[in-house]
Amino acid sequence: MSADEEILAHYGLTSLSQDYWTEKPDFAIANASVDVQSPTTGVHHERNRSEDILRTGGATSETTKDASAAGPVTPSFAMKRSQTSVQPSMSSQIAIGGMRNPMATRKIAGTYRDAPDNSMQQTSTGVHRSSSWLTTDGTHQLLSLMETNFNKFIAAKETIDNVYAQIISTLSHAGPAKTMDMCEESISGALQQLQLFNTESTNEVDISYGELLVMRECEALFTYPEKFRLYHKQEKYSLLMQEIENAKKLYEKDRERLAKVNPKLVYLVDHAWEIIQATIDGICASIWNQILQSQGDFAFVVRTLCDLLKLKPNPISGRDPVLYATVSQQKYLYNLMKERFSYFEKIIKSRQEDFSKLSCTRASPMLVWRAVARGCNLDYTLRGRPEVFAGMQLIEWANACVLKIVREIKEVELYAKEFISGIQQASYPEAAKHYGRDPKQMGVVVEKLNSQCLEMVYSFVGERGERLEMDGAFVLIQLHYFQRVADLLPKRIRTVFSMAATRCIVDTWMLQHAPQSKSANIEEMFIVDANENQVLEPELMVVDVLRELNKLYIPPHREEIVREIHHAFYKVLYANARFPSMSVSMANWESDVWSLASSTLIDFVQHRNQHDMKKLASKMTTSLPVFSTSITRSDVLHFVTRLLNLRSRLVPYQKFLLQTFPLNEVSPSLDPRISKSLRNLQDLYKLLAIRDTSFSNTTPSSISKLSIQPPTFQLFSTLETIYLELKDSMPPNEAADWMIATTSCMLAQFALHSPYAFFHDIPSISHFLNKCLPPTILDLLQQIQRKAEASSISPTTETATKTRLKFQFIEMIFS
């Protein structure tokens, strides 16, 4: 076997190439097959083998007497690195319990310190001289290999020695914290460099490795902060607390042990514990920031707060963390309220503005009323209409805005009650069990949340429900959707919403069914809905509105709102019970006609002045009002029927109003209003009866010997038709009153347009219409008859034809 192969076999190497070894990183060298089972057998064996190799080359190394006495010859580069690595040494300050041979350690350290400069120069000279005696390339390669490994060992050892020397020299001046801050990075790098040594046998190395042992013992404490941060990141707070307990036990154990060995080393352990405490404080601060920044998840806040107090019972310097966390949630919820309410205010305002620019067909009030009365689904009945969209938008506001906030507040309120009762503090450390137990402070936070929510709702809906207006939707539609929204809301918020919604309904009710312009024009009273060809009579829906309002605005009622409801009730009925009067009074017109009949007409008939009679009749007719729209007697009778029904229902309506919305005030009376409206309608009916009848004019030559003239018979036929209309449309008393008034007016019209027939048939008319005319008109007819007789106008005296006339009105029976 050659010399190279013997070297390779002895050291377990595969190659003597220097490039192979020097290009490898430190961890590769650490894992090499060189015998490094212990620092003693590794380092000192390297030194002895280097001397053997030198001697096998046949060279005689020149060494000093002091150096040869201290031990084997050390190469000059090793001595030089050793001298720099042991200033100052720990041999005079530290005695490590694990060191078995302190005398040998001091001897080795003394050798490094006492080696003179001339011996180092001689050794260096011997090494260079022996290099020329080497006979093989393997020898050069092995020396280079040994120098490389030994240089790495010396570099790592030198770092540890220098760092620890700096620690020892500055502990008493700068303190452990500042010193360790300066040296931790260097220590970490040195520990990585020394991974090639077996840590189990470190205590057998010289005094510099005693220093390393101390640092490794402290390293366990310095690794805890990283574990703490990892557990905090993973939110494994139970493991974190367990590791904190382990760190505390290790700290107490190491501190007690090192205090016995060397009290100065306690500074190092104390500093490690200070770093641990600072890490814990940082983690607690981070957890507290998470609690303050959490938004809406109060369950997370409570759970995290429990973990925080277990780590640090006093996280915010004596103040109540439970109270502060609750206040933080209160601030978040308030911001959430402002954000959500502002969003819905914006979209509702946009919808109202857009709708005002559009012309949409409104839902028929009659259709809605029938749907409500029959319990139909308005969403389906009104599908596709803007009223449904507006109503569903309010329902979305209740669900996505109000109810979401209320649920958050309820959660805070529930946890606040549990904190006040001490349920949540059961798992808290003893020093933190008093947190959150003040009912006044915790109650103030919850009450403030509720009051803020109420203020937001009040501001949103408006004092009179301005935000709730559904683009002029029919009052029953608004009531339907307002009721659906109110059913979703909790009690206190429902009260605020209901008051505003009730005022909005009251305003809409009066606006739609009691407009100020409704009483200005008679023709407007008879406008018919072109779509449905029906008119919803407001008095029909009074009970429906009151019933729905009673569901919407539940007790306790505020007096001013109840007064507004009463005001709207009477205003709607008052407006619909009012019928305007005409510009000309039919009573005055009739009186003028009878005055003419008793004077001027007699003269005209006596002198047969037909031209003046026609002129007078035209003048009296044109003095009556003319309507641009077609109004019939049946329309008037329908309106009369409504008023009569309203008068008959008024007392039940008033009782229902007082039952649903009690008010200790005297109810106004509508009887005078209804009576006046009926008189105005009666005048209109008389006017229409005159307009609808055209009497044929007669001349003296056309007067026949018959007892009843044709125009007189036409008058009786018209009165028969009117009698039947009134009998079917009114109660007996009202029908009789209207029949008498209409007969008198028709007779005046008859006298104006057919004076010859009138004067000829006065006796028959007085006899036949005895029950159909008021006493004043009967007396007036007798006076006219006497004047006619005095003027040589001979009226007929035939009355036997009464039995042959089959007119029902003559008897005036309406029952």
Curated annotation (Swiss-Prot):
Domain of life: Eukaryota
Subunit note: Component of the exocyst complex.
Family as reported in the entry's similarity comment: Belongs to the SEC5 family.
Protein name, per record: Exocyst complex component sec5
Annotated InterPro entries: EXOC2/Sec5 (IPR029175), EXOC2/Sec5_N_dom (IPR039481)
Function in brief: Component of the exocyst complex involved in the docking of exocytic vesicles with fusion sites on the plasma membrane.
Any one GO CC term of the record: cell tip
Biased composition (Basic and acidic residues): 43-54
